[in-house]
From Swiss-Prot:
Name of the gene this protein is made from: cysS
Transmembrane segments: none
Binding site for ATP: K274
Reaction equation(s) it catalyzes: tRNA(Cys) + L-cysteine + ATP = L-cysteinyl-tRNA(Cys) + AMP + diphosphate
PANTHER family per UniProt: CYSTEINE--TRNA LIGASE, CYTOPLASMIC, CYSTEINYL-TRNA SYNTHETASE
UniProt KW Aminoacyl-tRNA synthetase keyword: yes
Residue numbers binding Zn(2+): C29, C214, H239, E243
Gene Ontology biological process terms in this record: cysteinyl-tRNA aminoacylation
Pfam family, one: tRNA-synt_1e
Entries under Gene3D superfamilies matching the protein: Cysteine-tRNA ligase, C-terminal anti-codon recognition domain, HUPs
Motif mapping: 'KMSKS' region: 271-275
Quaternary data: Monomer.
UniProt protein name: Cysteine--tRNA ligase
Length: 472
């Protein structure tokens, strides 16, 4: 089975065939840098990070671009509130973004173009649209003439006539309505306002509109047509719809062959967003939960579906990550992998699952099956001092788990390093405790148990003198 992707543009799953063999050009709409990123942003960035990793593992070279919107009313409002500048606010939150992404082990994009660094390309694209009759200047602004583009609405499935029926109230509230030829036209360039940053242009000083930024960055860095355009489902309309209208009107070519959209993170049934005030920032979340537990939580739901945020779900993901982490550490410390390879059959099974529209949630089941088998052997080794299965078979299973964990971006040892104890050291202390209790030195046994507890190691005494352990 080959990779298939659900293409929002055609509302169906389609075989993935890149425009150029073994090369994938991929663009993600990035953040507007006026505040710290929240869990919704984490989901978007993490999902496309794993998609990129999977494509690379599948043999593709991936050229991945993600932009920063660093010109926006929200940034200007934040700058006024903090008595700062738009540039200073943007730099502050771009730096915070990179810190958050590093904490979540999200690979950097190949490029991070900014709107303020892309003005030549933006103005060139606006000029091209004007020359082709799709844009017009009006009182220092430049607008896109939506009705001139016959394909408008093909991504979102919306029709202008249907939208017009309920738009009268919104039109009356639009302060730019007198400048527009049609209520649905949108700004490509905004005339300068007093006290706001502005750049020279053929239409007068001003700044670009939001939608034109991405169209220009895609064309300048990846070409007229790319393989995959991704983003959150909240961007389908109007942002991605408007990107298509701009780019395809200017070039006469499709903007992207595949449009992929991730579902929203929800809190009590509503989208997590700053405007609703129901969000938790990534840095707040990571004070409470391991980054790898957050990664597991996000990957447990199919990328197209909504993801419900609860503390209970994150707690369950934490326990799941402990299982995977323990298995990864066990193999690293106890198994000899010289001249051993991963199990090709299991890797093929994983690929067959994930190739069905990036079903990472289904693929996770294979990782847990492997972790369960390795954990069983770990407990046998602790209590009997030897492995039950053939060590070479176990080493192959562990290498398979490690390879799959790498694809999904899981990094072991975080908790091990925090505890400062290796598995072998923990098992040695458990044995010392057993010996102390066997000699009726219960005070020493309690001391060792407390020592392990301080290091985040929980002991579970079971019948028959068996002691199991896990990290908190």
């Amino acid at each position: 089975m080959s990779l298939s992707l659900y293409n929002t543009l055609h509302r169906r799953s389609e075989p993935f065939e890149p425009l150029e063999a073994n090369l994938v050009r991929m663009y993600c709409c990035g953040i507007t840098v006026y505040d710290y990123c929240h869990l919704g942003h984490a989901r978007t960035c993490l999902i496309w990070d794993v998609v990129r990793r999977y494509l690379q593992w599948s043999g593709y070279e991936v050229h991945y671009i993600q932009n920063f919107t660093d010109i926006d009313d929200k940034i200007l409002n934040r700058a006024r509130a903090e008595k700062s500048s738009m540039g200073a606010i943007a730099e502050k939150f771009i730096e915070a973004y990179f810190e958050d992404m590093e904490a979540l082990h999200i690979q950097p994009a190949d490029e991070y173009p900014r709107a303020t660094h892309s003005l030549d390309g933006i103005q060139k694209l606006i000029h091209d649209l004007e020359q082709r009759g799709f844009a017009y200047a009006s009182q220092g602004d430049v607008y896109y003439a939506v009705r001139k583009f016959d394909g408008y609405g093909k991504l979102s499935g919306r029709k202008l006539d249907d939208m017009q029926a309920g738009a009268s109230g919104r039109v009356n509230e639009d302060p730019d309505a007198p400048k527009k030829h049609d209520p649905f036209d949108f700004a490509l360039w905004k005339a300068a306002k007093a006290g706001e940053p502005a750049w020279d242009s053929p239409w007068g000083a001003g700044r670009p509109g939001w939608h034109i930024e991405c169209s220009a960055m895609v064309r300048d860095r990846l070409g007229e047509t790319i393989d995959i355009h991704v983003g959150g489902s909240d961007l389908i309309f109007p942002h991605h719809e408007n990107e298509i209208a701009q780019s395809e009107a200017a070039t006469g070519q499709p903007l992207a062959k595949y449009w992929l959209h991730n579902g929203m993170v929800k809190v009590e049934g509503e989208k997590m967003s700053k405007s609703l005030g129901n969000f938790i920032t990534i840095r707040e979340l990571l004070k409470k939960y391991d980054p790898m537990a957050v990664r597991l939580f996000i990957l447990q739901a199919h990328y197209t579906k909504p993801l419900d945020f609860t503390d209970e779900a994150l707690t369950a993901a934490t326990k799941g990550w402990e299982t995977l982490n323990d298995a990864l550490l066990f193999g690293a410390e106890h198994l000899d992998t010289n001249n051993i390879t991963a199990d090709k059959g299991i890797l093929a099974k994983f690929k067959a699952i994930v190739d069905n529209d990036l079903n990472f949630s289904g693929g996770l089941a294979i990782l847990f099956e492997l972790a369960k088998e390795l954990k069983k052997e770990k407990n046998i080794l602790v209590h009997e001092g030897k492995l039950q299965q053939n060590p070479q078979i176990l080493a192959s299973l562990w290498l398979t788990l490690k390879e799959l964990a790498d694809i999904l971006g899981f990094v072991p040892e975080t908790k091990q390093q925090a505890a400062g104890l290796t598995d072998a050291e923990i098992e040695d202390l458990i044995q010392q405790r057993k010996d102390a209790r066997a000699n009726k030195n219960y005070a020493e046994g309690d001391r060792l148990r407390d020592l392990l507890a301080e290091k985040g190691i929980v002991l579970v005494d079971k019948p028959g003198g068996i002691t199991e352990w896990h990290r908190e």
